[in-house]
Structures are given as structure tokens and as C-alpha cells.
Amino acid sequence: MADPAGAGGEQEAPSVEAAFAGQPPPPWWQQVTVRAVAVSVVLGTLFSFMAMRTGLTAGFVPSFNMSASLLSFFIIKSWTRLMARCGVASQPFTRQENVVVQTCVISCATLSIYGGFTSYLLAMNETVAKAAGGGTDGRNVYTLHTGKIVAFLFLVTFSSLFCTLPLRNTMIVDYKLIYPSGSAVAGIVNSFHTPKGATKAKLQVNAMFKSVAGSFAWAFFQWFYTGGDGCGFHAFPLFGLEAYKEKFYFDFSASLVGVGMICPHLINFSMLLGSISSSGFIWPALQAKQGEWYTDPSPTSFKGINGYKVPMGVSMVLGDCLFQLGAITVKAVQHYRKGRQEQKLAVDGAADDGGGGCVPDDDDENKWHATYDERRRNQVFLSDGIPDQFAVAGYVALAALSTALVPRIFPQIRYHHVAVCYAVAPLLAFCNSYTSGLMDWSLATVYGKLAIFVVGASVGAASGGVIAGLAACGVMMVVIGDAAELMHDFKTAYLTLTSPVSMFASQAIGTALGCVVNPAVFLAFRWLAGAEHPPGDPRSAYAAPMAVAYRGIAVLGVEGVGTLPRHAIALCAACFAAAVFLDTAGAAARAARWRVGGWVPNPMAMAIPFFVGPTFAIDMCVGSLLLMAWRRADRQGAATLAVVVASGLICGEGLWTLPSAVLAMLKVQPPICMKFLSRSQIQEVRQHFVLGAADIQPAVTLTHHHHQ
């Protein structure tokens, strides 16, 4: 008998296409339906809002693939049932249409990240320039008009759809790359369209709606206690008032707790470690050196303490990025060489055997079924071809158009810089798509950061090198990142018998939707934040840590390290070395299968608190702890519902920002201020109380605001 584990792995494949044998896939034009596009508009806007809000607050954006698949299934399934009850005939809801909606939604939401609204575009404005310090002169500050943002996105994003399109058959059919995210989405969608999977989906939708309602109600309840500066649950000094001054407190944010439930525990606790090491030890030590190492007291100047904070964080980010780039490149080369050797051995073996032979154990039937599934998928995937000439012509035309027009949007960048970016992007996109297919890890942001250094340094500070570098980063990130996302979607299409043409069309629709929706969502966040503390301001609810990091990278690339305060270069070198050491230690431990390998801190996550402080790290660690407790109590329930409950927590609090903004616009103020005070402030508090003032020893004060 064959090994049971191995047999199970083989038997999983035939159960998929055998279950759908009586449901031939519809032609591609029946997969991209009007109702699919309509649902995509609604869900794309919702998930863009969630992704951008998370990026503006925490810096890390979790994957919403499962939630998008679930909600698209639920909405269209409910729609078809409603039409049936009303006696209106409607097209059957297929898994192919489900994949089309999911692809449109994620394509739209992904642009909130790759589009730069939480990173390189936001890093161009004056608010982030002041927060990061350095490079604040006129040529290195640029506030984009919404129309220019839309034009830039349309120019750059559509070229990414053509970049690696001719390689889809090579990557998926020939190399058989896994593309873990794409495969996972396919597994989810295939399961939804079976009776057992539909029951599970209904349970998950109910849990998500309850989570959304609970998160919204909690945010509404908290609003009543925010009647003043520093009031409410979001300023709860969990670790004491001294720690509160260093931003060590729990702010009861349901959305950040939800993000913590989705993000890996390693990321969350790495951020906590970075928070403790920076705010607890490094910053107090540097503050004690004021007057000796630096004299500028401004907290945002590169001549002051910010000349240590931002460059040290940037050094850790770059150390981690360069290590990952080298490590993944080595793995990709090894995997490619191994695959070529196996193909050669297979050809030689077939020649020696005369092309015949049979398998001498009882895995024959399973392998035949696996071959059937593979043949069926290959047949559908290869039947609807997109001509390679169309892809090449589309990329060349859009690259030429972008080369001519992007410098008109960003006058600081030259035509030849854009042309070089488009010339090298296909090669880097292939490398990124290949490695993403192996390890589900996109290096688009790494290539973008390298573009900042190269282009920024070539332009120079006097000519606006900061803006030029950030613009080049945008071109590289969007083209390379979206090209890898498209390959994940093609893998989903392959495993669900969805036509590649409909997949390309849904990507184009989602991309066009994202180019319009995301600028509008960003405008909404600017309106919600207000003119006093706009996005990117350290005091804003949307501090945008990655925008500060990208700005710091651009300033360092243009101005060099010679402008930094005393000993800053040595500290940056130490942070860079620490990042490389941690990555090396983690890789070695995982290779040796040591249990500690999964708990070596992640340098990228450790660096985030260097830019915005430790507050959100506390919330995300609470999310990890809640998930650990849930898994201990009910592992199966946590595996089924944790992601959707977390998505509901993120969505519910995010939805509350809209009515709260309307209340603020109508000048409706919260009635109560809940504030935490030290004993030294008691005398001031007593002046506002009449009864029992002599006996009051509070640590918390509740004050009612009366409206006349």
C-alpha cells in the first residue's frame, strides 16, 4: 500500500474536478457579467477603504483575499435566490464568476498599497516632509492634484497588465509554480460551490456580520467619551502615565486588534520588541545626549533627534530588504536549476524505457485522476489564448505614453529616467513573479526602494531628487507588483477552470476601478483627518508610517549621510548589521528546523515603531493573544472563523469613521471627556468638581459637556 499521507495528497486533486464534471465552464463573456462588475464596484470600494485605513495607521496591510471571496459569493448567491423568489430568471452563479469578482475586488484594493497612497505619493507632500525632516525646499515637496493622481495611475497600472502576460503559460503550465495565495483562493472558491462549502460560507458570513456590528457599536460607544483633547478609551494609560508619554498605551482599537489577528504572530511581537527597544531604551539615551551630539531641539529636524530615528529605521528596512532580495534570488536560481535537471532526467529516463512502463503500486488510479485534472485544466487554460503580440504591443505603447507624460506630472523626473524604469521592469517583474510563485513573497517594494536611491541620486537635491526618486519608485512598484498579482490570479483561474481572457478582463476592470476609487477614498481620509492633522502628521489618526520611511529613504539617497548628526552613521550601520544578523539567524534556524526559527524577530516589523511609536504594536499584539487563546479553546472554530471575524473588526470601526465625520461636520460634540491624570494634576481637577472635592484622589476624570 502507498503511504496514507501521500495518498491523501493525491486524492485531493480528483475530488475537485470530479465534483464539477457536470458543470462545463461557460465562455469567458458569460463569466464577466454585469452583476459581477456591479458587486465588484461595491466590494472594491469597501476593501480599498479598509486596506488604505490599515496602511495609514499600522503600515502593514493584511491579505483580504478570503474575505473578498466570501463576500462576493454571499452577495451574488443572495441575489440569485432573491431573483428566483421573485420569479425572475437569472444566470446560474458559477465559481468562474466568483473568481472574476474576487479578482476585480483585490485588483482595486491592491492599488491602495501599490498606488502609493500610504507610501511614496503621500511622502511627496509637505506634511510628511516636515515629519521626516530634511529635503523640505520647494523642488523636493510636491502636492499632487487628484486629477494628476488618477492620470498617473492609469498610465502606470495598465502597463503592468501586459508586462508578464506572455509568460503565463510558462510560469503556470510548464514550471507548475505554486503561487500560494492564488492556490488558496482557488481552494476557497471551489469549496464554496459544493454543498458542504456553502454551509461553511454561510457560517462565516454570519460571524463576519456580527463582528462588523460589534466593532461599529464599540466605536460608537467610545465616541461618547472623547469630548476633548486626549480624552476617551483611545488614550488609556495601560502601562502608567510615564509610559503613556512615550506612546506606550492600549487605545482599544478594534480594527488594529483585527489586523493583529490576521498578521503573523512573529510580525506583531517583532513590532512590540522594536517598540520596547526604541522608545524604552534608544530614544531616552539619545535625548540625554542633546547638546553634546546634536543641538537642534526640534523633534522633526534631521539635525536633531529625528536625524537618528528615521535613518536608523530606514537602515533596518534596507538591511532586511537586501537580505531578502539576495536570499530569494539564490533560492529561485536553485529551484530553476533543479527543475531543469529533473526535466533532463525525465527525458533521459523516457528514452531509456522506450517511453513505456507502468507504476508498480496501487497509486495508479490516483495518478490517473491527477493527470485527468491537470489535462482538464491545461485544456481550458490554453484554449482561450491571448496573443503574445498583443501583450508586447500593449506594453510598448503604454511605456512610450508613460515616458512622455509622467515627467509632465512630476517635472522633477526626466524622460530617460522613466524610459529606463520601463526597460528594466519586465526583467525584474519576471524575477519577482517567479519568486512570488515559489514563496508568496513579492519584492516589488524592494525594487521600488532601490529606484529611489538610483534615480534620486542621479537627479540631485537641487533639482528635486526626492520627488524624482519617489516617482520612479511608483513606476517600479506598480509595474512589478501588479504583474506578480496577475500571475496569482492566473493560478486561481487555472485551478477553477476560469478563462484567462476573463481573468485579464477582470484585472483590467478592477484596475480601472481602482484608479478612480482609491483617489476618492484618499480624499475621504484627508477630509476625515481634517486640515489640522492631515494624513502623514505624527499627531494624526493616520500617521502613515511607511510614508515617513519612504521619505527618509529618498532624503538619504539625495542628501547623503554627511548631513546627519554626530554618531548617526555608526548607529545606522549597527541597525543595518542587526537586521542582516537577525535575518541570517532566522534563515539558519529554519533551515536547521530549530523550534526557535519561527520566533527570530523580523527586522522590517521592528523598524516600523521607529517612525510612528509603539501604540499600534500594543493593539496588534492583543490581537495575537486573542487568537492564541481562541485556538487553545477551539482550534477548529478559530481556523474557520478567525480571518472573517478579524476582517469584520477592521471593517466595523472603519465604517464608524463616516458617521463620526458627519457628526463633527454638524458640530455635534461628544458629551463626556474621560481623561487620565497624575496625582500632581489633582489640584487642577478639583477646581472643576463641587461635591467631595477634598476627598477626591482620582486617576481618571469624567467631565460632562453641557450644550446650551
From Swiss-Prot:
Report the membrane topology from the UniProt record.
Answer: Multi-pass membrane protein
Listed GO cellular component terms? membrane
The parts of the chain that form a coiled coil are none
Where primarily located? membrane
Keyword set, alphabetical order:
Membrane, Transmembrane, Transmembrane helix, Transport
- Would you say which domain of life the source belongs to? Eukaryota
Q: Which GO terms describe its molecular function?
A: oligopeptide transmembrane transporter activity
| UniProt-annotated location(s) | Membrane
Per the UniProt record, which residue ranges are transmembrane? 32-52, 56-76, 104-124, 147-167, 216-236, 256-276, 310-330, 390-410, 418-438, 450-470, 503-523, 568-588, 608-628, 638-658
Q: Which family does it belong to?
A: Belongs to the YSL (TC 2.A.67.2) family.
Q: Which PANTHER family match?
A: METAL-NICOTIANAMINE TRANSPORTER YSL1-RELATED, OLIGOPEPTIDE TRANSPORTER YGL114W-RELATED
Q: What does this protein do?
A: May be involved in the transport of nicotianamine-chelated metals.
The protein's name is Probable metal-nicotianamine transporter YSL1
Q: What is the scientific name of the source organism? A: Oryza sativa subsp. japonica
